[in-house]
Each structure stands twice: as structure tokens, then as C-alpha cells.
């Protein structure tokens, strides 16, 4: 999946170079301006939810569940695709929780767009091609398996309005937001940049994830 997304965005070499850049330096390379109107935003602007963009037979949600959890078992008859059970150490709270596939239980573990799609839309994604928006919505760089209630609490918030309760994860979290915004040419608002810089000054050697 990662190779395909890099190909779609033309970002391979640039992203590898960015990996050696500190997040604090990288945030200064982002354009700073106010949010654009939400006019025209719909989830469908980023493609149907959880496509199989790498054509491995599994949708993006299951790819990320498989990446982020341990002790995984799969639904009978789905080979190694549909995750039926797994254990997640939630990055946002530090708590260990179980994922059990089912109508009433699947949503307890959700896949968070670290840069929320509506936030992305209002900070430049409305200018991107449909292909790049689909790539962003399915990019492992922008996706984490997390506690569902915290994902819902975050909603479409940026770093100025929401941060993970687990303070030790905040540097990694905002660095990932910076990496996504840099990769897709998105901007940050003044309040968002101030919040990110405040966090990153506590961890000045934090690098960008790729």
C-alpha cells in the first residue's frame, strides 16, 4: 500500500528526505493561513470509505487493523484479510483494548485520519485531484487504529482543538500531522501552528514519520 500511495502522490524521494528533517523545522515550511470554507466538503470527495487501493484483497481499514494490533485472528474464509480479533495498545490513551468484529463491537476500535478529512479539505485538499484525495484518505501515514470514543471526541479537530490524552504521545501525534500536511501540500492555521510548535519545543529532535 505504501509504495502505491507514494507513486500516486509522486512523493517517494521527497518523503524519504523529509524523514531526516525534524518536525519542528518541517512545520516552519508549511504555509500559514486561515481555514477555507467547508463548502463542497463530503466524505465522498475522498473516495468511498476504505478502498482496497493496493489491490491486496483487503480494504484499508483491515490493513491498518492488521498493522497496529497484535494477537490477530481472521474471520473464517477470509484468508488473512478480515480481522476478527486483536489486541490494541491505544496510542491516544495508552490503554490496552480488545477488538472483536461484530455489529455492536467493531466501532470500539476505529481508524483515525490523523489529519481529519474535513480539516484537510479546509486547508488545501479541495484543490487536490480526486486521485490524490483518495491516496490521502487511504495513506498509512495518515491512519492509526485508536480507541473509538477518543476518535469521536476528536472529530475533525486540529492540534489547536484536540490532542491525545496521553501526553507522552503528543510529539509523535503532531509530527505525523505535520508529515501529512507537508506531503500533500496542506496549510496550517495560525492557532494550529502555535499548538504544534508548543508541543514540538518539548521534543526538538522529533523527526517526521514516513
Question: Can you describe what each PLM-predicted range is?
Answer:
Residues 1-3:
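N-terminal export and membrane-targeting signals
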Residues 20-23, 84-85, 143:
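Compositionally biased, low-hydrophobicity segments enriched in charged and small polar residues
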Residues 37-109, 114-115:
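Secreted/periplasmic proteins that engage bacterial cell-wall peptidoglycan
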Residues 83, 92-210:
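Domain-level detector of nuclease and nuclease-like folds
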Residues 15-18, 29, 34, 41, ...:
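Short, flexible coil/linker segments at or flanking structured domains
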Residues 24, 40, 47, 71, ...:
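A near-ubiquitous, low-amplitude feature marking generic local secondary-structure context
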Residues 5-7, 13-58, 190-194, 201-210:
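N-terminal module-boundary/linker segments of secreted carbohydrate-active enzymes
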Residues 6-8, 30, 82, 90, ...:
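Compositionally biased, low-complexity repeat tracts
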Amino acid at each position: 500500500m505504501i509504495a502505491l500511495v507514494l507513486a500516486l502522490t509522486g512523493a517517494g524521494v521527497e518523503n524519504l528526505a523529509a524523514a531526516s528533517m525534524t518536525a519542528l523545522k518541517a512545520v516552519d515550511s508549511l504555509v500559514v493561513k486561515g481555514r477555507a470554507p467547508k463548502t463542497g466538503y463530503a466524505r465522498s470527495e475522498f473516495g468511498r470509505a476504505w478502498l482496497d487501493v493496493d489491490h491486496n484483497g483487503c480494504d484499508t481499514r483491515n490493513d491498518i487493523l492488521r498493522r497496529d494490533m497484535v494477537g490477530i485472528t481472521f474471520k473464517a474464509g477470509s484468508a488473512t484479510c478480515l480481522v476478527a480479533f486483536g489486541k490494541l495498545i491505544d496510542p491516544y490513551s495508552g490503554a490496552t483494548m480488545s477488538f472483536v468484529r461484530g455489529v455492536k463491537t467493531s466501532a470500539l476500535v476505529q481508524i483515525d485520519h490523523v489529519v481529519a478529512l474535513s480539516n484537510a479539505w479546509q486547508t488545501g485538499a479541495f484543490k487536490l485531484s480526486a486521485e490524490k484525495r483518495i491516496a490521502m484518505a487511504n495513506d498509512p501515514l495518515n491512519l492509526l487504529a485508536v480507541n473509538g470514543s477518543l476518535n469521536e471526541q476528536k472529530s475533525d479537530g486540529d492540534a489547536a482543538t484536540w490532542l491525545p490524552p496521553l501526553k507522552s504521545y503528543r510529539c509523535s501525534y503532531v509530527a505525523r500531522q505535520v508529515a501529512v500536511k507537508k506531503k500533500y501540500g496542506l496549510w496550517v492555521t495560525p492557532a494550529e501552528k502555535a499548538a504544534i510548535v508548543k508541543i514540538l519545543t518539548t521534543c526538538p529532535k522529533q523527526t517526521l514519520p514516513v
